[in-house]
Regions:
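Bacterial N-terminal signal peptides
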Residues: 5-17
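Active-site gating loops and adjacent loop-to-helix segments of metal-dependent hydrolytic enzymes
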Residues: 96-114, 172-188, 223-237, 292-328
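Divalent metal-dependent hydrolysis catalytic cores, especially in the metallo-beta-lactamase
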Residues: 119-143, 158-168, 212-225, 253, ...
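His/Asp/Glu-enriched, well-ordered alpha-helical/loop segment
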Residues: 249, 253, 317-408
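Histidine/acidic-residue-rich catalytic or RNA/ligand-binding cores of hydrolases
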Residues: 98-99, 145, 174, 225-227, ...
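Histidine-rich, glycine-flanked metal-binding segment
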Residues: 22-26, 35, 40-84, 152
Length: 436
C-alpha cells in the first residue's frame, strides 16, 4: 500500500508542478441546467458561469453570460446536472490510514508515512467535491498536516485548500493523549499534553510556532480512545480561557472537542470559536451557545457508523461500547441546536469515503436538504473566515465548482454522485468523460 501511495505521490507532484507552472489561460464557460444559489437557498435554471483564471467573473442566465464570453472561451457543458459551490469539511483528520481505528494506529507509522497517507486521503475529499477543509488536529510530532497545507498552497501536490489545527491539546490521560500503552511502556511526554494553565498556554504557543491556523482543545473525554470518559470534563475552564486568550492574541481561532455537558458549557464560557460534536448538549448549553454565537460542528454520522461496526475496524471494545452509549443522546442534542438557531457547519470526523453520510444524517436529524448543503458551503466558509473567497458562487469569488447528478435540494442522496470538480478554475475531476 505504501508503495502505491508513493507512486501516486510522485504523480501528484508532477501534476501539481504542471498546474502551478501553467494556470488556466483561457476563459471557461460552464453551462448548467440547475445552479444552487447557496446564499439565498434557491435554484436558478439554465445558468452559466464565466471563469477567468481562478475566479468567477460573471454568473447568470446562460443566454446573457454566453454573449459576454470571448471567442476563445472553453465551454464545459454540464446540462442535466446540478451545479453548486465546492464543499467545505470543517472537521477532517487527514493523516494516516483512516481505516485503522485502533488506539495505537498513529504509533505504528512514522510522521513521513502518515503524511504520505494524507496525500492519498486528500484525493478522496476531492472525489466527493470537497475543495476546502479544516484539519481538526492530529497527534503528529512532525506536523504533517501543516506540510500538506503548505504543499497544496505552493502547487506541489493536488488537494483541497486547507486550514489546520496543530496537535490536540489535552490533559495527561485525556482524549488527546496518544499514549495508550502499558505503564512500563509509556511514551516520553509530548508537547501537546498540558495539566496546568501555564502548560496549556505553552502548548498553544508551540502549535502557533509551527504554523497552526487553529488551536484544538480537548475539553472532554471522547469515544475512540480506551481511556477517557465522554461525560467527564478534562481541561478546566481556566485552562481553556487561557488558551483562547493566547490564541486570539495571535489572531488564531480555537475549536474544542466537547461531548459532555459540563465541558461544552465551560468551553463556550471560555470563548472558543466552535464546539466539535456537542453530543450531550443540554438546554442551558444550547442557550449559552446561542447567546455567544458559538459555532457547532456536530459530526453526526461518525458515531452512527461506529455503533454498527465491529472489532475488525481496530476500535477497542471500550470505544465500541462508548459509541453505542453516546448515540442515544445525539438526536435530542441536535434538535436543541436547531431549536436555538445555532450556527452549524459541516464536519465529518471520519474516513472521507463516508462524506455523503453526514449530509444524510443532518437531514435525518431535522435540517432540510438545502440547510444541510449550506452547512458545507456558506456556513462553513463563515466559520473559517473565508466567506469573501469561497462558499457561494458569486462574481469575484474562487471558481470552486462541483456538479452532481440529480437535485440535492429535494434528495440529499444526490450528493453521493459528484461527477465534476473544479478548484480555483482547474478541472480536477470529470467522470462524465468515463460515462460517454
Amino acid at each position: 500500500m505504501i508503495r502505491r501511495i508513493l507512486v501516486g505521490l510522485f504523480s501528484l507532484i508532477a501534476v501539481g508542478i504542471a498546474f502551478a507552472a501553467s494556470p488556466p489561460n483561457e476563459p471557461i464557460l460552464i453551462k448548467t441546467t440547475r445552479l444552487i444559489d447557496m446564499s439565498k437557498g434557491s435554484i436558478a435554471n439554465d445558468q452559466a458561469i464565466l471563469i477567468n483564471g481562478a475566479t468567477v467573473v460573471e454568473i447568470g442566465p446562460s443566454s446573457v453570460v454566453s454573449q459576454h464570453a470571448a471567442g476563445n472561451v472553453r465551454v464545459v457543458d454540464l446540462t442535466g446536472l446540478t451545479v453548486l459551490p465546492g464543499l467545505i469539511d470543517c472537521h477532517a483528520h487527514v493523516l494516516g490510514n483512516l481505516k485503522d481505528l485502533s488506539a495505537v494506529a498513529q504509533l505504528r507509522i512514522s510522521s513521513a508515512q502518515a503524511t504520505l497517507w494524507g496525500v492519498h486521503n486528500l484525493q478522496i475529499w476531492l472525489d466527493h467535491g470537497f475543495t476546502t477543509l479544516r484539519d481538526a488536529g492530529e497527534q503528529d510530532l512532525g506536523y504533517g498536516q501543516l506540510a500538506l497545507r503548505d504543499s497544496i498552497k505552493m502547487g506541489l501536490i493536488e488537494g483541497p485548500r486547507m486550514v489546520s489545527a496543530g496537535n490536540f491539546i489535552s490533559v495527561t490521560g485525556g482524549h488527546g493523549d496518544a499514549d495508550a500503552l502499558a505503564v512500563d511502556q509509556a511514551l516520553p511526554p509530548r508537547p501537546n499534553l498540558a495539566d496546568t494553565v501555564d502548560g496549556v498556554a505553552a502548548a498553544v504557543r508551540h502549535d502557533i510556532k509551527y504554523g497552526a491556523d487553529w488551536i484544538k482543545l480537548m475539553a472532554t473525554g471522547g469515544i475512540s480512545d480506551p481511556m477517557s470518559d465522554f461525560n467527564v470534563q478534562e481541561l478546566s475552564e481556566e485552562q481553556m480561557s487561557r488558551a483562547v486568550e493566547v490564541a486570539h492574541r495571535a489572531h488564531k481561532l480555537v475549536m474544542a472537542h466537547a461531548e459532555g455537558q459540563d465541558g461544552i458549557k465551560s468551553a463556550v464560557r471560555a470563548g472558543v470559536d466552535s464546539i466539535e460534536h456537542g453530543t450531550l448538549l443540554d438546554e442551558e448549553g444550547a442557550a449559552l451557545m446561542e447567546k455567544k454565537g458559538t459555532w457547532l460542528v456536530p459530526t453526526l454520522s461518525v458515531m452512527q457508523r461506529y455503533a454498527t461496526i465491529g472489532r475488525e475496524s481496530g476500535l477497542d471494545p471500550v470505544a465500541l461500547e462508548k459509541s453505542r452509549l453516546i448515540l442515544k443522546y445525539q438526536s435530542d442534542a441536535f434538535q436543541r441546536a436547531i431549536k436555538h438557531h445555532l450556527r452549524i457547519a459541516f464536519g465529518l470526523d471520519d474516513d472521507p469515503d463516508y462524506l455523503p453520510n453526514e449530509f444524510a444524517a443532518m437531514v435525518k436529524g431535522g435540517l432540510t436538504p438545502t440547510e444541510a448543503l449550506q452547512t458545507a458551503t456558506t456556513h462553513a466558509a463563515e466559520l473559517l473566515g473565508l466567506s469573501s473567497e469561497i462558499g457561494s458562487l458569486e462574481q469575484g469569488k474562487a471558481a470552486d465548482i462541483i456538479a452532481v447528478s440529480g437535485d440535492p435540494t429535494t434528495d440529499i442522496h444526490a450528493m453521493e454522485t459528484v461527477v465534476f470538480v473544479m478548484k480555483a478554475g482547474k478541472i480536477l475531476r470529470d467522470t462524465r468523460a468515463k460515462e460517454k
